[in-house]
């Protein structure tokens, strides 16, 4: 009897990762975890869009937020200031063309001033 319970418990534990929450891209970008929310990075025609999403997959209001994208472009580091653009998006213009999947870090500063970082590899 104990063996059956042990086997059943092991099967349940091994199945747990299947229930893990994986954030989904709603704007065609890449989504990573950053502090208490998810960050989606979208690069379009020299513009960086950063969408903030809560753990319920709902867009977050970005009023009072600011950000900085530090991206590696053509082997050089480029800093792009991000400002609110719409209700749930921060946006900034790059100095030139961007790859569709830029690599780097996005730093988000909420109104409380506690900076969080999202790494995009």
What are these regions (language model features)?
Residues 15-121:
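Intrinsically disordered, low-complexity terminal tails/loops enriched in metal-binding residues
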Residues 2-4:
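Bacterial Sec-dependent N-terminal signal peptides
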Residues 7-17:
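Bacterial N-terminal signal peptides
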């Amino acid at each position: 009897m104990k063996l059956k319970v042990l086997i059943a418990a092991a099967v349940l534990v091994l199945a747990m990762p299947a229930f893990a929450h994986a954030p989904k891209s709603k704007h065609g970008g890449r989504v990573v975890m950053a502090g208490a929310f998810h960050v989606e990075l979208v690069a379009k025609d020299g513009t960086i869009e950063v969408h903030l999403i809560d753990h319920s997959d709902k867009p977050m209001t970005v009023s009072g937020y600011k950000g900085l994208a530090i991206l590696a472009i053509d082997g050089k580091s480029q800093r792009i200031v991000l400002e609110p653009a719409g209700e749930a998006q921060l946006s900034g213009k790059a100095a030139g063309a961007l790859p569709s999947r830029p690599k780097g870090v996005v730093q988000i500063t909420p109104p409380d001033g506690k900076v969080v970082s999202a790494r995009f590899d």
